[in-house]
Design a protein with these regions (language model features):
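Conserved small/aromatic sequence motifs within transmembrane helices
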Residues: 1-145
Length: 145
């Protein structure tokens, strides 16, 4: 774990979305989204190809969401505990995603880290089951992450 890998997703943003460098997703009003991409993101369908990552053993269904190195380096400048997340496979869904949503600021990234560390300390089959059920409910009833 902790090694870089290619994460599969449906393209939801324009090809030049990061021409000015890496940027965080700003929600449904993000101008970089395509029309189809907005629909995919709103219904979390852009994540479906990550099931291939799960099948290949690079990801788990539940675990801390993977992050790009550019943002990991920024998080590590504020909180070195990020390295603890390398103990387990990253996940398609996570405890942090359910309660923190998408991260578009450093404060939210650090809050997500705290949720992920809580998950790491308390993970169990029962905890994973609750995360799975809540994720399913949120997707079915359209709650925005």
């Amino acid at each position: 774990f902790g090694r870089p890998f290619y994460i599969y997703k449906f393209r939801s943003m324009r090809l030049d979305a990061e021409k000015m460098g890496p940027a965080l997703y700003r929600g449904g009003k993000d101008k970089r989204l395509t029309k189809v991409g907005k629909f995919l993101r709103e219904h979390h369908l852009d994540e479906l190809p990550q099931l291939w990552n799960v099948f290949c053993g690079q990801m788990a269904f539940i675990g801390p969401r993977p992050e790009r190195k550019y943002f990991i380096d920024q998080i590590m400048e504020h909180d070195a505990r990020y390295v603890f997340l390398y103990q387990i496979r990253p996940g398609v869904t996570s405890y942090a995603t359910l309660y923190n949503g998408y991260t578009d600021t450093m404060d939210k990234m650090l809050r997500r880290l705290r949720y992920d560390l809580f998950y790491l300390q308390h993970r169990s089959w029962w905890f994973d089951f609750k995360i799975l059920v809540k994720t399913f409910i949120n997707i079915c009833f359209g709650k925005k992450f």
